[in-house]
Regions:
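Conserved Helicase C-terminal RecA-like lobe
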Residues: 1-14, 73, 86
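Conserved P-loop NTPase motor "coupling/switch" region that bridges the ATPase
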Residues: 6-9, 27-38, 42, 49-50, ...
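Conserved nucleic-acid-binding Ia/Ib motif block in the N-terminal RecA-like helicase ATPase lobe
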Residues: 12, 17-60, 64-65
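Conserved nucleotide-binding/hydrolysis micro-motifs of P-loop NTPases
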Residues: 16-18, 45-46, 72-74, 100, ...
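Conserved helix/coil segment N-terminal to the catalytic DExD/H
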Residues: 46-66, 70-89, 103
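Short N-terminal helix/helix-N-cap motif within the alpha/beta-hydrolase-1
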Residues: 75-78, 102-110, 133-135
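Walker B catalytic acidic pair
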Residues: 96-97
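Residues immediately C-terminal
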Residues: 100-103, 124
């Protein structure tokens, strides 16, 4: 912000910590000389909340901060508002607990990665340094920078790093991960 590279921040966090970002982390860690407007997204919008949300689009020198629950990005209303915010600002978009975007098939993951491409800068945060699977890293890295891991798709990434086996479940054939390779 001080260097003029951003004028907006979109923080996406799990339900359990989203309010803490708004009430605790931002007031505690944002330096005093930065004038800012912070708004916490809520799914049911009152007139006051709508006024607060609209204030994020007023011109001025303030840093505009939108804090959203990750679940909001599973809804059209939430995605549309985040997209409007991103298109109106030079934004840093941060995902807290980035393992919430590990499933490449999930609608929410697809929405968040698409929104991330509209942000000037992206960051991921997690308190879980070890994932359940190396495959969990693909979409998190894709959010940061498409192609970062050198693969055009999740499936080419999976082919390189996962040992797959075909299994039958109720007459349906599916690929399951049975191990990993090329991890060094």
């Amino acid at each position: 912000y001080d260097k003029g590279k951003i004028n907006g921040v979109l923080i996406v966090a799990p339900k359990g910590v989203v309010k803490n970002w708004y009430e605790g982390e931002i007031p505690t860690h944002l330096v005093d000389h930065i004038e800012h407007k912070s708004v916490l997204w809520q799914s049911s919008i009152t007139q006051t909340q709508q006024k607060n949300l609209n204030s994020l689009f007023e011109t001025g020198e303030d840093l505009h901060i939108l804090v959203m629950n990750v679940e909001a990005l599973s809804t059209k209303k939430g995605v549309d508002f985040a997209a409007k915010f991103l298109s109106s600002h030079r934004t840093l978009m941060a995902i807290d607990e980035s393992t919430t975007i590990k499933n490449p098939e999930a609608k929410r993951t697809k929405n968040i990665c698409a929104l991330g491409r509209e942000a000037a800068y992206t960051r991921i945060l997690t308190g879980s340094p070890v994932t359940k699977s190396p495959l969990d890293l693909y979409k998190q890295c894709e959010f940061l920078c498409p192609g970062l891991l050198g693969h055009e798709s999740y499936y080419t990434f999976r082919t390189r790093y996962a040992v797959m086996r075909t299994a039958n479940f109720g007459g349906r054939s599916v690929q399951i991960v049975v191990g990993y390779r090329n991890l060094d």
